Amino acid sequence: MTDPRLVTPERRGDDLGDAALRPQHLSEFVGQQQARANLQIFIDAARKRKEALDHVLFVGPPGLGKTTLAQIVARELGVGFRATSGPVIAKAGDLAALLTNLEERDVLFIDEIHRLSPAVEEVLYPAMEDFQLDLIIGEGPAARSVKIDLSKFTLVGATTRAGLLTNPLRDRFGIPVRLNFYTIEELESIVKRGARVLGTGITADGANEIARRARGTPRIAGRLLRRVRDFASAADADAIDRKIADHALGALEVDAAGLDAMDRRYLSTIALNYGGGPVGVETMAAALSEPRDAIEDIIEPYLIQCGYLQRTPRGRLLTASAFRHLGLAEPARDPGQFGLFGGEEDGD
């Protein structure tokens, strides 16, 4: 995206202030009830046996708490925590430096693990399975293989795109955990806790208003809370209520469904310029002056989740709900526009 959006689930520079809002223990973590319960059992068992926890893979959309849970896992285990990301580990030597500095049962967190290079993955396999590094030292005839024993550690990987993980890497994670979008009630609890941490008063309806527009994502809820708090402070309000939250979020162009100006521009372009669709993703990328991957990975997922957009074999198609949200009349359309099977398209 050309501009950072307030409702993007991706991490932004101003999200650094979120650290204070993050829960420190599983008991404080809101949502993901089954995943939390299972993690607590696995952590308790590892502590009782005084063993390293099996490798953990967190899968889910951005902003749902994968990094926070990784930090909590290390804290609950009472071990060290090291964090990095797939793109940062450029070569096998970078990974070797990280692994050889880990203490017994430490947690190594790799965000965006699907972006590891094949060469780095090859080094990671024996490290995960046998806690050994197999490295080639030197080049040509003088090259030799060296085995280095590692401390037993726990690798925690996080990915938003599980389909890009290779099968050998995926199969080495003993504890796969899928994170789902949060309910409004769960987000209300997160907003209320965030307000307490920030020392800001908030009413139940004020928390609900922020939660409803947070797109099922705690990161967005925290970001909206901080911005609404600014409006409340400027108005000398004692607490954030629904009226203040509605005014602030309206001024920030986040509507009642959590859509921002870019979302509405996307929907309006299809509705007004292409009769509601179908229209290909390349056409939409050109119309909005945005790269195709931004359309597919950032804009469209939430619109599909809300039921405003369909991906059909012939292109993107607006639903009746989208026209109602835009306040437009739905045009009469040929049922054939939905394609033979109504499945997804490649977006060409």
From Swiss-Prot:
Main location: cytoplasm
Annotated binding of ATP, by residue: L21, R22, G63, K66, T67, T68, E129, D130, F131, R172, Y182, R219
Keywords of this entry: ATP-binding, Cytoplasm, DNA damage, DNA recombination, DNA repair, DNA-binding, Hydrolase, Nucleotide-binding
Gene3D superfamilies: 1.10.8.60, P-loop containing nucleotide triphosphate hydrolases, Winged helix-like DNA-binding domain superfamily/Winged helix DNA-binding domain
GO CC annotations, alphabetized: cytoplasm; Holliday junction resolvase complex
Large ATPase domain (RuvB-L): region residues: 2-182
Domain of life: Bacteria
Region (Small ATPAse domain (RuvB-S)): 183-253
Name of the protein described by the UniProt record: Holliday junction branch migration complex subunit RuvB
Localization terms from the record: Cytoplasm
Record text about domains: Has 3 domains, the large (RuvB-L) and small ATPase (RuvB-S) domains and the C-terminal head (RuvB-H) domain. The head domain binds DNA, while the ATPase domains jointly bind ATP, ADP or are empty depending on the state of the subunit in the translocation cycle. During a single DNA translocation step the structure of each domain remains the same, but their relative positions change.
Amino-acid positions noted as binding DNA in the UniProt annotation, renumbered to this chain: R292, R311, R316
Region (Head domain (RuvB-H)): 256-348
Quaternary context: Homohexamer. Forms an RuvA(8)-RuvB(12)-Holliday junction (HJ) complex. HJ DNA is sandwiched between 2 RuvA tetramers; dsDNA enters through RuvA and exits via RuvB. An RuvB hexamer assembles on each DNA strand where it exits the tetramer. Each RuvB hexamer is contacted by two RuvA subunits (via domain III) on 2 adjacent RuvB subunits; this complex drives branch migration. In the full resolvosome a probable DNA-RuvA(4)-RuvB(12)-RuvC(2) complex forms which resolves the HJ.
